[in-house]
Structures are given as structure tokens and as C-alpha cells.
């Protein structure tokens, strides 16, 4: 199947309900209401730092797409809104542009339309292991230059690769290759999951190679479900059945934040099933330093209401902070909270600090 059709399939399926699976467990986190906050809403300050750079909000636009005409149009709109609001933006996997120079423009529009905000380049883990160190360094340089990236993300998508008809489930040697990426990039390296979460054990290993971890937890967009839908369309009954069995595989985002924070003292980005500013505020209270959203912004972009979506998330974060008496993001991180039985049991069994 042509890669451009696959990319467009991902766009439409990711924006649909068929891709939304499970719960990220933010309903297991209750931020305690402060009836006497002793601040005005106008005093709430949501500015923060993204890997050292000051940004206007504690969230950014997560990795989504690139490589087709539709993807290029979406990336242009996302970049414009990121620039307008002063928030970071990731791009989708750039492998397609490295192999097909004629589609580089679908990523370069991000550099053009968001010149001043932090931009995050993106390469997939399976491709790292198959490249020589020299070729990998070349790819990293090109990916960074393509969007004038401030940081580069390496996405871990083992679960997707085993279901995807064109999948490449090759992960031997990836850890050492991330070291090559870090040396070649000369800028922050983010290691991220894409919907199945990161455990304490993996987080502790990433101390050596990552400047940040993006947990990419379970409970939102499921690439297993997306690939299962594609398999059904192509007539692959076996892959469809396997996807159905494994679509609930993963670490819920709320639990994955606790897992990552327990194994890694560096910068943590929350993603996966964050559907509101309140979800994002809960992620920050759990220990994340920043959060990203993808599906809500993709859907809003396709429906022509992207600015409203960003404004709504900003309002929700501010209100959550006001109602917990948190003037700053740092205050929010220490806001009193109560955990539901599933998350509390997970924390206790896994001996997590959260």
C-alpha cells in the first residue's frame, strides 16, 4: 500500500472515534477544590519552560502527521496557531520526507509558519537500528534542518509495528542508536511512546540517553486500533483479530506519569488521552512538567475550529489552577489530590513515588 495512502488513513482514523480506546485514568485523579484560593483568576500564570525555553502555556501540539498534501495543509494550520499562542509543536515521523524529498515541504511549512516557537523533529525507533551511524547522523541533521527544530523526538512504537501491515518490529540495538542521535543532534532528545506508555524500568534506562521522556500513555488514540482498522479494510483477518486482542495493551497515562517520575528525575512530558485542560492539569499535578495533545487539535483543525480548541484548553488549565489555589505551574504540582482505587493500587503494587 502506498505510503501517502497510509499517512492519510492515519489522519482520518486518528481523528475518528474508532481510534479512541480505553481510559488514561485521569478520572482516577481528583484535584481537591480550594474554596478559599486567596488569588484572583487574573493572577494565574500558566507560562512555563519547555526544555529551558520560556513558552506561554504548559502544553504543546503533539506529533501527528506529514508526507501528503493533506498533511502539509494540516501542519501549516497547526504551525500558525502554535506561533500565535507561543506554544511548542511536534511534527509527525519525518522518515517519509527523508526518503521522498518531494514531500519535504509538508514539514517545512512548520518552519515557515512557526519561526519563533520550539519545534520538535521526529524519527522512529525501528528505523534507527537499520542505519549505519553515519547515515543516522545524516538523517538526524536533515530532520532537524527541515523544520529548524529545537529538539528531536525518537518515538517508540513497538506495539504499532507488530500490527501494521508494513510494520518493521525491529528494536534490537535501538538504545545504542539513541546515543548516536543525541551526539549528532546537538540539541535535546526526547524519547516518546505513542500510546502504550513507559514503565519505571524503561524510564530509568533512558536516564543515560534522553533529555526528556514523553510517556505517550494508553487511553487515547490507539495505533493498534488504527492498524487493526486498516487491516480489516485490506482483508487481513489475522491482523484485525490480533489488533482486537491487543488494543487494550499498555500503561494508562496517569499511571505512566507516575512510572516515569519514579524512574527518571529529568523532564517529563505527558501525552496520551489528554482531552482537556483539566486532564492536563492533573498530569502536571501527578509529576509531569508539560503535556501535549494531538487528536483534539487534529480533529479541530479538520473541522475549522483550531483557535477555539486552544483557547478552551488554556481556559481549562487556568480554571483548574484557580480552583486549587495554584498561582503558578509549580504551585499546581503540589496541589492536594486524591487517587481512585485503580491508580492507588497501581502505585502501591509498583512501589511508585507519585
Curated annotation (Swiss-Prot):
Keywords: Cytoplasm, Flavoprotein, FMN, Isomerase, Isoprene biosynthesis, Magnesium, Metal-binding, NADP. Substrate binds at residues 6-7, 93-95, 160. This is Isopentenyl-diphosphate delta-isomerase. It is found in: Cytoplasm. Its cofactor is FMN; NADPH; Mg(2+). NCBIfam families: IPP_isom_2. Transmembrane segments: none annotated. FMN binds at residues 63-65, 93, 122, 192, 221, 273-275, 294-295.
Amino acid at each position: 500500500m502506498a505510503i501517502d495512502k497510509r499517512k492519510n488513513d492515519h489522519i482520518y482514523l486518528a481523528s475518528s472515534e474508532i481510534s479512541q480506546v480505553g481510559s488514561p485514568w485521569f478520572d482516577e485523579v481528583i484535584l481537591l477544590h480550594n474554596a478559599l484560593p486567596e488569588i484572583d483568576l487574573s493572577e494565574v500564570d500558566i507560562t512555563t519552560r519547555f526544555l529551558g525555553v520560556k513558552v506561554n502555556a504548559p502544553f504543546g501540539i503533539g506529533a501527528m502527521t506529514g508526507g501528503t498534501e493533506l498533511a502539509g495543509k494540516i501542519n501549516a494550520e497547526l504551525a500558525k496557531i502554535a506561533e500565535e499562542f507561543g506554544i511548542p509543536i511536534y511534527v509527525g515521523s519525518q522518515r517519509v520526507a527523508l526518503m521522498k524529498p518531494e514531500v519535504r515541504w509538508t514539514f517545512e511549512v512548520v518552519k515557515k509558519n512557526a519561526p519563533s516557537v520550539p519545534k520538535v523533529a521526529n524519527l522512529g525507533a525501528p528505523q534507527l537500528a537499520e542505519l549505519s551511524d553515519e547515515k543516522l547522523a545524516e538523517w538526524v541533521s536533515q530532520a532537524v534542518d527541515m523544520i529548524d527544530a529545537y529538539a528531536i523526538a525518537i518515538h517508540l512504537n513497538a506495539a504499532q509495528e507488530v500490527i501494521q501491515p508494513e510494520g518493521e518490529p525491529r528494536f534490537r540495538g535501538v538504545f545504542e542508536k539513541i546515543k548516536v542521535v543525541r551526539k549528532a543532534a546537538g540539541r535535546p532528545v526526547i524519547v516518546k511512546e505513542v500510546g502504550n506508555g513507559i514503565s519505571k524500568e524503561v524510564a530509568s534506562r533512558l536516564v543515560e540517553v534522553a533529555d526528556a521522556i514523553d510517556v505517550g500513555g494508553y487511553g487515547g488514540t490507539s495505533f493498534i486500533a488504527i492498524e487493526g482498522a486498516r487491516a480489516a479494510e485490506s482483508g487481513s483477518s489475522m491482523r484485525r483479530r490480533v489488533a482486537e486482542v491487543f488494543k487494550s495493551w499498555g500503561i494508562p497515562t496517569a499511571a505512566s506519569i507516575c512510572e516515569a517520575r519514579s524512574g527518571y528525575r529529568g523532564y517529563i512530558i505527558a501525552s496520551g488521552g489528554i482531552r482537556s485542560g483539566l486532564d492536563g492539569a492533573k498530569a502536571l499535578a501527578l509529576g509531569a512538567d508539560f503535556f501535549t495533545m494531538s487528536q483534539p487539535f487534529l480533529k479541530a483543525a479538520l473541522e475549522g475550529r483550531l483557535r477555539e480548541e486552544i483557547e478552551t484548553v488554556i481556559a481549562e488549565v487556568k480554571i483548574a489552577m484557580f480552583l486549587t489555589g495554584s498561582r503558578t505551574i509549580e504551585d499546581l504540582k503540589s496541589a492536594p489530590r486524591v487517587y481512585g482505587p485503580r491508580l492507588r493500587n497501581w502505585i502501591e503494587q509498583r512501589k511508585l513515588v507519585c
